Amino acid sequence: MTDTRDVVIVGSGGANIASLTGALERLGADAALSTDADEIRGARAVILPGVGAAADAMTRLHSFGLDALLPALAQPVLGICLGMQLLAAGSEEDDAECLGVVPGRARRLPASPDLPVPHMGWNRVRKDGGSVLLRDVPDGAHFYFIHSYALPLADTTTGRTEYGSEFTAVFESGNFFATQFHPERSSAHGATVLRNFLEHAL
């Protein structure tokens, strides 16, 4: 890692990035929020966070021309929470069409009296094959989630979680990585995930 600004966080709207920026700075990375295509294109690593509705986030990305830019990026990209779902083909939420980096559509989690939706709080992540992001993370480690939609299991899944049914907690596909949980809110294991991404990217 260098002292120059290496990480650009995409301003996808609705996300409080203070905790994410702080977590990256503690790991020695200089990160900045941006919706500027040239700045994003020139970054050594890109993070796509997000909370809220997929359709609203896609509208915001489209307004900056980022819906075409992001899938074409060649540097490492990390999607977090809604950012993970935006990297998929689409979402059942408002029938949104997303960036299409990986196949599949985010589905609403099944609700029950014992398992309310949104899924909020700590849950286990089981490793599913080799994973860059989960290197040095124990199998079954707990991470912090807050979401109502999730991607089904797929060939790109490298970490899975169960909440009513199993869903993809981590995927890795080429230079694209994603977590449904919030690593910046997930204590030491979350810091390890972010460090693994930064070490891979920088």
Predicted regions and their residues:
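Short, low-complexity, intrinsically disordered N-terminal peptides in bacterial proteins
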Residues: 1-8, 26-28, 199-202
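Cysteine-nucleophile active-site neighborhood
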Residues: 51-120
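Amide-donor transfer/coupling interface in amidating biosynthetic enzymes
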Residues: 72, 105-202
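N-terminal beta1-alpha1 ligand-phosphate binding loop
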Residues: 7-29, 183-185
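Short gly/ser/thr-rich secondary-structure transition/capping motifs
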Residues: 26-33, 59-62, 122-128, 160-162
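Structural alpha-helical scaffold elements that stabilize or flank donor/cofactor-binding regions
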Residues: 39-40, 69, 170
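Short acidic low-complexity segments
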Residues: 31-42
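Short acidic/histidine-rich motifs immediately flanking catalytic phosphotransfer sites
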Residues: 40-50
